[in-house]
Amino acid sequence: MIIHRINECDSVLNVAQKLLSEGSLQVYDSVQARVQTAGRGQYGRTWQSPEGNLYCAMRLPLEGCYRQGPLPLIFAVHLMCALENLGLSLRIKWMNDLVAFGGKVGGILLEKKGGALIAGIGINCVAAPDPEQMRADHALPATTLKAAFPDKEAFFDPEKLWDSVSAEIAAVSLDWLEANWLERARHALLWRNKEVTLRDGDSVKTGILIGLEAD
């Protein structure tokens, strides 16, 4: 498992794709940058990437539960389990956001190209976007690991954090993940058993979020 570390890039996902094309990115190898100049999030949004936070891309195995299904949600559980093993307990907001004590602390973005699956991961270690930098309809404020877990100072450093998290991700059994991801996702789901409103274009629906189904 190799971590390719660089000071600055446009996007760690782009660097990972380049390494992949060169045959230099094996399963669970990753890229970490101190700063991204064009980090991207869900739906093509810009991911604010100041120095001091974690910006990584990791190649995932295309086997087990990663063969099919809601891959972003499966990886969110995979990452959440790795963080839990380090004492960082998070929730999942459907299906790309990581939440700590009511604030968004990170996000993921999966890309499947060239027969490989790569996960982009961003975690706010010490800095979070100002409210005016977030989209107008954001559902949660942004927060940081430093604010949410003040006693976990060892993980405020993004390189030390990724050293630990990447090792934990690689250590999770794919057989265990395949058997347990859905149940873990149900229990980690933010706003479970609460009233939520879903907006899809002009359509607005309100109901109680009771859980998830495999499909």
Question: Model segments located where?
Answer:
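N-terminal lobe of the biotin/lipoate ligase/transferase fold
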Residues: M1-E84, L88
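Long, positively charged amphipathic alpha-helical accessory segments at protein N-termini or as interdomain linkers
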Residues: G64-Y66, P70-L90, A100-D215
